Design a protein with these regions (language model features):
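Electrostatic cytochrome c docking/interface patches
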Residues: 23-46, 57-68, 77
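Residue-level signal for alpha-helical context at structural boundaries
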Residues: 62, 70-73, 130, 142
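Generic alpha-helical secondary structure signal
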Residues: 39, 75, 119-122
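Glycine-rich loops and low-complexity Gly/Arg-rich segments
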Residues: 53-54, 79, 136-140
Length: 144
């Protein structure tokens, strides 16, 4: 049941983003990405695990695959990216309980495994750059 809902959400977001992009209503900043820049990718993994993984899962990724893709040893990944005794072959889930997510956010924050593939790196870059300080919000930030 949960898998069907996730698939529907991914498909809906893909269709929605495609229709918005086709209509020309959304300007996307260009993400100057370089998938060969291993140091930058390692930094991105560190930032995600430190700032995003508390709420967002990337359940189609495994810790040992991140180690392999980023030329890191399993011990380095365990030391710097695994915080709750996970095993290298496990998928990356969030520690946030669903009932807490519903209470705090009105729903479970989306799994980010396929966002860049579904919406594109320019969309992700634009979205992340859209955050600003907003003291009226619970977490002190908001997004355009």
């Amino acid at each position: 049941m949960k898998i069907r809902i996730k698939i529907k959400l991914i498909l809906a977001s893909t269709l929605l983003s495609s229709s918005v992009l086709a209509s020309g209503e959304l300007h996307l900043d260009h993400a100057n990405t370089n998938i060969s820049d291993t140091a930058s990718l390692q930094n991105g993994a560190k930032l995600f695990m430190n700032y995003c993984s508390g709420c967002h899962a990337i359940s189609f990724m495994r810790y040992n695959r991140i180690a392999q893709d980023l030329n890191l040893s399993d011990s380095l990944v365990a030391q710097h990216l695994m915080f709750a005794g996970e095993k290298p072959g496990e998928t990356i889930t969030t520690a946030m309980p669903e009932e807490g997510a519903a209470k705090w956010f009105g729903g479970t924050p989306p799994d980010l495994s396929l966002v860049a593939r579904a919406k594109g790196t320019d969309w992700v870059y634009t979205y992340l750059r859209g955050f600003y300080k907003d003291d009226s919000k619970v977490f002190g930030v908001n997004n355009k």
